[in-house]
Amino acid sequence: MITDYEWPLWQTTALVCGIDEAGRGPLAGPVVAAAVIFPRWFRPVGTILERVNDSKKLSAAERELLAPAIRNAAAFWAVAEVDPETIDQINILQATMLAMNQAVAALPIQPELLLVDGNRFRTELPIPYETVVKGDSKVFSIAAASVLAKTHRDELMVAYASEYPQYGFERHVGYPTRAHVEAIRQHGRCPIHRQSFRLRQLGEKP
């Protein structure tokens, strides 16, 4: 992927920021968002960053290779987490919006334009934004943000696996796999599980 989407925007706007999240669907762990600003007129042609894509289309090894390259090439980047307790309090959609806003606020400079994956966004900041459906497959900056968010969250979940080894977080990173649901059936939920995410497989009602 290259920066074709950003180039027309860079004609008038220097600080274009891509935003994406990871972790809306899991039963455990935080939702994570990343915000990435590349230098104006940046082109990844001829570099490893040509391989940047929607994090879901990349293998774990590819993401781990690309993440440090993205951080090195970016002018600015930031990552933010919203914990399971907050997700339970305000719901996953609101928690995702909060994480995205926190990631932007954590940047050392205020962007001039936000490019957000998806079809909805609610900003707490006085910054113009565009939502881009399937933006992580179309917009380089958003795809890069998706890789940073995903790798950051996966690292957190692998760390949690040593604290709660009975759940196998290092394998499914909190997603509702059959093995994860069975572990919850056997051991109940642990402190990083989202209590508001109910499981029909266990006879739980919404």
From Swiss-Prot:
GO terms for biological process: DNA replication, removal of RNA primer; mismatch repair. It holds the Pfam family RNase_HII. GO terms for cellular component: cytoplasm; ribonuclease H2 complex. Its cofactor is Mn(2+); Mg(2+). Manganese or magnesium. Binds 1 divalent metal ion per monomer in the absence of substrate. May bind a second metal ion after substrate binding. A divalent metal cation binds at D20, E21, D117. It is found in: Cytoplasm. GO terms for molecular function: manganese ion binding; RNA binding; RNA-DNA hybrid ribonuclease activity. Residues 14-206 form the RNase H type-2 domain. Endonuclease that specifically degrades the RNA of RNA-DNA hybrids. Belongs to the RNase HII family. HAMAP family: RNase_HII_B (MF_00052_B). PANTHER family: RIBONUCLEASE H2 SUBUNIT A, RIBONUCLEASE HII. This is Ribonuclease HII. It comes from Pelodictyon phaeoclathratiforme (strain DSM 5477 / BU-1). The gene is rnhB.
